[in-house]
């Protein structure tokens, strides 16, 4: 077992597990070392062997979808998507790049790893059905740690009706790696791409933006305070919501369902994983259009705004460039306006223009600020 562990803080279990039923009501954090957590119980992965580990991690994943003919237990899964399009997406999460185990509980990590994939399928106006999970772990992780990750994966599968149909687990020389592939279905003629936005279309977003990024800034701030001063209790009072948005995001299946109920088919759509500005660039570039979004129309969470003011941070910068909101950004025909305003939790933030007008944010005084694609980039 590795001897070197960085000291980190984790949520007090009695409080943070409330995040799974279904929201964080209050959070109280305690500090401990990773070594101390592992010492509570530590079953070496090698003691189970490959097949024993697979059985232990996947035995409580019942099949839920008719399209899954064969899941775990053979050389390959078998799916049947008769008369429907198949959608496939994949996301790779690397310790130290995409998550920090200083403050991310393993259960939440498993849940979030699933959600970021489901969100991509919903962003295509599809329905996610199956996932494949592959994990690389160093020797500092135990069977119990993997079970924690899989408990979060299982919860996401149960809530969203997803089948776990396969994957792989391998030793890693450093850290923790999680790769999830999600398979979903889309109806013919109903799949929404990024390249369909047209001049005069409305630009819409679900939910509110900036909370996940400000939650991350809060966690990073308190980590630095702990590492430099050894303070035992971080200051998270009144910040439950932004922590939830960072640690346990949700995919907006409800928005897709409501759009269908109101007979609205977006002309272009994607999820907001890397920041509003970056995603607007994707849609406008692929659709060969420009856009105008209005600062006073962008939905911003109250806790996010308060946190930004406390940290002397521009909340609009957080919204444009922060990311990890996993809300839906989409465009629709102007003729859908009356139907759109009947749907809760959707905001109209601007409109599509001709390409020569470029992309701009219209400030509260009417000034136009050129948008830049400065979203989060793991390769930088």
Where are these regions (language model features)?
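Extreme N-terminal cap/leader segments of soluble proteins
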Residues: 33-105, 124, 133, 152-155
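Short, compositionally biased
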Residues: 215-236
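Glycine-/charge-enriched secondary-structure boundary and capping motifs
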Residues: 38-52, 56-62, 104, 140-163, ...
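Small-aliphatic-rich amphipathic alpha-helix that forms the alpha element of a beta-alpha
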Residues: 106-130, 151-159, 258, 278-283
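Glycine-rich anion-binding loops of enzyme active sites
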Residues: 80-83, 93, 128-222, 351
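Residue-level signal for inorganic ion chemistry
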Residues: 78, 117, 125, 164, ...
């Amino acid at each position: 077992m590795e001897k070197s562990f960085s000291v980190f803080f984790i949520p007090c279990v009695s409080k943070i597990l409330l995040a799974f039923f279904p929201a964080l009501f209050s959070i109280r954090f305690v500090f401990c070392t990773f070594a101390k957590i592992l010492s509570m119980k530590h079953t070496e992965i090698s003691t189970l062997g490959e097949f024993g580990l697979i059985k232990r991690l996947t035995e409580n994943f019942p099949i839920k979808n008719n399209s899954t003919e064969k899941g775990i237990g053979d050389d390959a899964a078998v799916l049947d998507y008769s008369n429907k399009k198949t959608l496939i997406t994949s996301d790779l999460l690397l310790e130290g790049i995409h998550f920090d185990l200083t403050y991310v509980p393993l259960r939440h990590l498993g849940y979030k790893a699933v959600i970021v994939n489901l969100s991509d399928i919903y962003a295509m106006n599809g329905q996610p059905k199956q996932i494949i999970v592959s994990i690389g772990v160093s020797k500092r992780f135990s069977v119990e740690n993997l079970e924690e990750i899989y408990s979060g994966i299982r919860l996401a599968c149960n809530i969203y009706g997803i089948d776990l149909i396969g994957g792989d687990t391998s030793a890693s020389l450093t850290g923790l790696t999680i790769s999830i592939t999600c398979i979903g279905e889309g109806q013919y003629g109903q799949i929404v791409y990024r390249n369909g936005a047209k001049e005069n279309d409305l630009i819409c977003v679900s939910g509110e933006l900036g909370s996940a990024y400000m939650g991350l800034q809060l966690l990073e701030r308190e980590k630095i305070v702990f590492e430099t001063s050894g303070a035992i209790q971080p200051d998270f009072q009144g910040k439950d919501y932004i922590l939830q948005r960072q640690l346990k995001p949700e995919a907006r299946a409800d928005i897709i369902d409501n759009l269908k109920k109101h007979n609205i088919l977006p002309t272009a759509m994607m999820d907001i994983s890397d920041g509003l500005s970056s995603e607007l660039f994707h849609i406008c570039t692929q659709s060969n259009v420009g856009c105008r979004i209005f600062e006073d129309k962008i939905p911003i969470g109250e806790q996010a705004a308060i946190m930004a003011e406390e940290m002397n941070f521009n909340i609009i910068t957080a919204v444009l460039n922060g990311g990890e909101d996993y809300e839906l950004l989409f465009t629709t025909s102007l003729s859908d306006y009356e139907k759109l305003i009947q749907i809760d939790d959707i905001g109209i933030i601007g409109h599509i223009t001709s390409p020569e007008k470029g992309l701009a944010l219209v400030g509260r005084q009417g000034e136009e600020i050129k948008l830049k694609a400065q979203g989060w980039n793991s390769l930088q």
